[in-house]
Amino acid sequence: MIIRPVDEVRGELNAPPSKSYTHRAYFLALLAEGESTIENPLVCDDTLATIEAIRSFGAGVDGKTVVPPEEPSPGFVYARESGTTARFSTALAGGIGGKTLIDGARRLRERPMDGLVKALKGLGAEVDGFSLPLTVKGPVKSGRVSVDASKSSQFVSGLLLLGAEVGLKVEARNPVSKPYIEMTLRTMEAFGVEFEREGFSFEVYPGVKGTRYKVPGDYSTASFFLAAGALYGKVRVNNLLREDVQADMAFLDALEEFGARVKRGRDYVKVEGGELKAVALDCSDFPDSFPILAVVAAYAEGRSVIRARQLRFKESDRVRAMAVNLSRMGVKVRELEDGLEIEGGRPRGAKVETFNDHRIAMAMSIAALGATGPSIIEDTESVSKSHPGFFDDLRRLLE
C-alpha cells in the first residue's frame, strides 16, 4: 500500500468495538447458565478464533447469541494468531474432564505459555507441553494457585475465568498489563460472577449468569486515529466511555505528556496537535500503545525513551520491528532491551514492513502521513487481526 503525506488530518470517527471485551464476553457466555446476547461484538480474525474455540467446547453461536452447553466438553482449539484465545482456552480446559488440544499459527507457537502451564499443573491438571501445541486434561483438583504473570496478564485473566467455572483462589505475582485484569473482572461482574480481592489476590466463586452484554468501544484501535490528531491536526473519536478501565486509556495521558491537547467527553475523546516535546514513558501496563507512541516520539522535538517489559513477546518483536521501520524513515533510533530511544524530527518516506503485526501496520500508516515523501507499507492485510476496517476509517479522516 502506498501512503502519501498530507497537509493535515481533521475529522470524526466511531471507535470499533473492543477486542479485549469481546473475547471475555464470549468466553463467559460459554460458561454461563442460560443464553447470552453479545451486542456490538468486534468481528475480526482474533474474535472469530474465540468464537470457534467456544464452539469446540460445545457452545452454540448464532450471530450475537450464545447458547452454552450443559457442560463444556473437551475438543480441539485452533487459536489462529490470537494469544487471548489460546491462553483463555488453555485455562478453561483445566476445568474439563478429558483431553483438549490447543494449537495456533507459527508466531503464536513462539509466545510464552509457561506461567499458565505451571499454574494449571499446580492445580492438578495434566498438561503436555510448555508452548503450543499442548494438551490439557482436567479437571483441576485444587482450589488455590499462584501464577507468575510477569510475561502476560492473560495468564491471570484465564485463571479468573477458570475460577468462574470451578471456583478458585488466584494470586498474581509480578503482573504486567494490570488494566487488562481489571477488564476481566469488570466483564465477570456483568455476567454475575462473584469474587473477592485484596490487591492482586482473588477468590472467585463458581457461577456465571447468561446476560445481554454490550461491548464498549476500543481505546486500543482508537489510539492510532487520536495520534493522527496529535501529529497532524484534530481528531474526535466517539464511542469511547470515560468511565472505563481499558489499558490504552493511559495513551491519552501519554499524548498530554508529549504536549498534545486532549479532551475527554462522557462518550468521546478529542485530540488536537500542539508543540510536541520528547518524553520518557514506561507503557508496561498498556503495551499495545508502544508502536504508535514510538511514532509520536519520532515527530516530537528531542530524545524520547519509550519502554515496556513484554514487547518482544507480542505478534512480533515490537521493539525490533519499530527500530527497523523508523530507521528506514531516517529516524535516529537506539534499540534497548525493553524499548527504544528515539530522536525526534521529520521522518522521510520509505518502504517499511509490518512483520505480520496489525499494530505495526497501523502505526507505520500513521507515521507515513507526515513524512517528507510517499511510503510503501508492505502486507497491510494484518490489520484484519483486530480492525478489518482500519484503512476505511483512515480514509474518512483524510477526505
Curated annotation (Swiss-Prot):
Pfam families per record: EPSP_synthase (PF00275)
BP terms from Gene Ontology: amino acid biosynthetic process; aromatic amino acid family biosynthetic process; chorismate biosynthetic process
Subcellular location: Cytoplasm
Reaction it catalyzes: 3-phosphoshikimate + phosphoenolpyruvate = 5-O-(1-carboxyvinyl)-3-phosphoshikimate + phosphate
InterPro entries referenced in this protein's UniProt entry, alphabetically: Enolpyruvate_Tfrase_dom, Enolpyruvate_Tfrase_sf, EPSP_synthase, EPSP_synthase_CS, RNA3'P_cycl/enolpyr_Trfase_a/b
Residues spanning the signal sequence: none
Keyword Transferase recorded: yes
TM regions (residue ranges): none
MF term (GO), any: 3-phosphoshikimate 1-carboxyvinyltransferase activity
Keyword set, alphabetical order: Amino-acid biosynthesis, Aromatic amino acid biosynthesis, Cytoplasm, Transferase
One GO cellular component, as annotated: cytoplasm
UniProt cross-references to SUPFAM superfamilies, sorted A to Z: EPT/RTPC-like (SSF55205)
Active-site residues (renumbered): D288
Residues annotated for phosphoenolpyruvate binding in this entry: K19, G83, R111, Q154, R318, R359, K385
Pathway: Metabolic intermediate biosynthesis; chorismate biosynthesis
Enzyme class: transferase
Transferase listed as a keyword: yes
HAMAP family in the record: EPSP_synth
Entries under NCBIfam families matching the protein: aroA
Record protein name field: 3-phosphoshikimate 1-carboxyvinyltransferase
